[in-house]
Each structure stands twice: as C-alpha cells, then as structure tokens.
A protein has these predicted regions:
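Domain-terminus/edge residues, biased toward the C-terminal soluble/receptor-binding domains
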Residues: 185-408
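Sec-dependent N-terminal signal peptides of Gram-positive bacterial secreted proteins and lipoproteins
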Residues: 4-26
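Hydrophobic alpha-helical segments, especially transmembrane helices
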Residues: 8-9, 84, 267
Length: 408
C-alpha cells in the first residue's frame, strides 16, 4: 500500500442547502497557528499493508465505524471466535450460579476438551472460564444445552443476538465454532460482523463487566460439584500482554477456518477492535499476532476522538425562521421565531477521525412557514457527513408556537 500525503484539514466543510437550492460555500475556522507553513501542516499516513489474514477489520468500538478493512464483508468460517457470542448470550440469559450437567453429547465433543464426563456437574460460572480461557468445546455444548435446552435452540439465540447487532452476514450453528453446514448455510461470520459482536460485548452489553472479567483472567481453577475432580485453565490470549491497553480477545482454529482472532484494546478515550479470519494455517500460528499489532498500531497512530456535539455547527442552522401570517403587535404579519436542533433517538456522539479527515455538514432548512405553527414543528435537518456517509442527523424544530393573525 502506498503512502498517502494529505494536508491537515483544520476547518469543517459546510454544504448548506435551502429548499430553494441556494448554496453557501464553506468558511474555514481560525487556525491554531496561522503562521504554520504548508509543510508543517502536511500529514503522512501509512495504511496497514501485507496482512496475512484473508479478512481483516479494524473498528472503532464506540461508534462502530470501520477504520480499515480487507475483505471485511466476506463470510468465512470463524472457529472458536464464535465463543464470544456463546459467552455473552449465556451471561444475558442465565444465572452463573446454576448447576450444569454434562450430557452424553457434550461429553463426546472433540478436542479441545475439558473432558467432563457424562452426568458430571459444574457451576455455570466455572464452565464460562473453561469456555473462554481454554476454549473447551465440550463446555460450550454443555452451556448451550443448559441455557436453551438444546444446541439448536441456543444457536437460535445466537443468531437473534447477531441480527439485533446488525450482523447481516453471520450464521451460527454450533456454540463452539466447529465447522458445520445445514440447509441454511455454513457456520461463519465476516470480520466486520465479528468486530461488531466484540464491540457489543465490551461496550454495550449489560453484562460487559463480567465478560471482561472472564476474558481478562490469566488463570482459573475449579472443581466439579462433587469435589472429586479439579480443573485448571490458562488464558491463551497472548495479546493481553503484547500491547498496553489490551482488554479482551479470543483465538480460534479449525482446518477450514485457519487461525482466527478477535481482540480489543483501549487507550485513553479510544477503544479499538480487530477481527481476523483465515490468518494462516499451521505452521503460521503467530501471523494473527503480527496482523493484530499492525492494525492496532495504525489505529493508535492515525486516529483521534472527536466529540460531534462540540463541533461548531453552521450558524444558519439555528437562525430565526420567518413565519408569515402571524399574530404580531404591528401590522407586518411577519414573525421571526427561534429554531433549535434535537435528536429523538440514540445517535453517535463521539467518533474516531483519521488525522486527514474532517466532518462536513449538510443543512436542509425551510426558508419560511405560514402561521399557525406549533412548537416542535420540524423545519429541516442537519446532517454530519464523513467521507460521503451520514454519521449523525439532527432535526431542526421550532422553539415556540406561533398564532395566526385573526382577520375577523
């Protein structure tokens, strides 16, 4: 990938559109140092290159914005990275103090295994550590059967959650990520969807703290309910000690999926998620760490957090609106009433911008209205645009009601 040279964009661009299609050019904001030379304002950004993974995604976990992608929307098998969804569904649907009994089917799962015996009982909490630290396939099935009654029903919960999170190219069949296919397709996801799931697990889920506690634990020991067998688990997510700020992650491997990984890192007020699919096959176990570090470092070096609510919006957005036919103290029948912006649903407030990027505004607003009008009447929209995509939209509404002139 070639290096790109960019001029530092200090000003926000503005596209102002009246309903009559008038245009106002952008006006730059004052620079921090107007004496800076062009060379001093020049920014050099090098994008990730030579990644091993077939699919890769770097995501801003707070906004869901994809900061870098390589075939990030191609569905592939994802092996044990599946287990982040298994864990979050379990945490949101069951009490960790429940007792889980291994079935014959759970006990028959292939390696990697806890080697629980059919009929053996464990605390659900203990099996969650087994699931995430050692990636035990039998524990995943035992958990699924306990939470939903069957693996199939649990997969239904997983797919419901995926759809809820906007993961449109994800289909889960197994709770452990083992390769499988049925009449609806094959078990798999995309790098972008996998990053969305991890972002939810660490940022939005009501059980995010428990998710982080489990996935950050270096080692964990427990026994079965009878106390006749003891078990020890060690965390195989080496990325936790590779970079400052690493907070979670899950590895995966099958012969079909190759090495896979999803991990999260938090630096100050920025949270990054990396998802990798098909990142090498034996003997290339360390490719995923190289790709993860390169993507995370790119995010740290190249992006800054911007609070959209602190940006200076176009002054034209909230200037008074002309209301004709209004009841006034004189005979003008014209009243100027205030306009304010508001949002009625949850929208992005903070977003990571690359140092060569800027937000543009698109303003659509009526020029005048006829009385009577009610407070809260929508008179336009203010859109925040990044690289041609709307990242936030606010309604412009009348602050006060205006009564019509009584001609009687």
């Amino acid at each position: 990938m070639k290096k790109r040279r960019w001029k530092k964009m200090i000003a926000l661009s503005l596209l102002f559109i009246f309903f009559s299609s008038n245009h106002i050019p952008a006006e730059p904001l004052p620079q921090d140092n107007p004496d800076e030379t062009q060379e001093e304002n020049e920014i050099e950004i090098e994008e990730p290159k030579n990644l091993y993974a077939l699919s890769a995604c770097l995501m801003d976990a707070d906004s869901g914005r994809i900061l870098f992608g390589k075939e990030e929307d191609v569905r592939r098998a994802n092996a044990s990275t599946t287990k982040i969804m298994t864990l979050i569904v379990t945490l949101e649907h069951a009490d960790l103090n429940n007792v889980v009994t291994f079935s014959d089917y759970a006990a028959s799962q292939p390696d990697v295994q806890l080697n629980g015996a059919s009929g053996e009982q464990f605390l659900l909490k203990d099996l969650c550590f087994s699931l995430m630290l050692e990636s035990h396939n039998d524990s995943a099935v035992a958990i699924a059967e306990h939470v939903a009654g069957s693996v199939e029903a649990f997969a239904g919960l997983m797919n419901e959650k995926a759809a809820e999170l906007g993961c449109m190219d994800t289909y889960f069949i197994t709770p452990n990520g083992l390769d499988k296919e049925d009449e609806n397709g094959f078990h798999g996801t995309t790098a972008a969807d996998l990053a969305r799931i991890m972002s939810y697990c660490i940022n939005e889920s009501p059980m995010k703290e428990t998710f982080l506690e489990i996935t950050q634990t270096p080692s964990y020991s427990f026994s079965n309910i009878e106390g006749t067998r003891n078990y020890s688990c060690n965390n195989h997510n080496r990325f936790l000690t590779m970079m400052d700020g690493a907070i979670s992650g899950k590895t995966g491997f099958t012969g079909n999926a190759g090495y896979c990984y999803v991990g999260a890192l938090r630096r100050d007020d920025r949270t990054y998620v990396v998802a990798l699919l098909g990142c090498g096959w034996p003997n290339n176990k360390n490719y995923k760490w190289a790709d993860t570090k390169q993507l995370m470092q790119y995010g740290i070096d190249s992006f800054e957090k911007v609070n959209l609510l602190e940006l200076e919006i176009p002054k034209e957005a909230e200037c008074p609106l002309e209301i004709s036919g209004a009841k006034t103290e004189d005979y003008s029948r014209i009243k100027m009433t205030e306009v304010q912006n508001r949002t009625e649903e949850k929208q992005i407030e903070n977003i990571l911008l690359r140092k060569d990027e800027s937000i543009e505004f698109k303003l659509e607003r009526k020029q005048r209205l006829e009385a009577p009008v009610e407070a809260g009447t929508t008179v336009g929209t203010l859109k925040y645009i990044l690289n041609g995509q709307v990242v936030r939209e606010e309604k412009l509404v009348l602050k006060d009601s205006v009564t019509a002139w009584d001609y009687r």
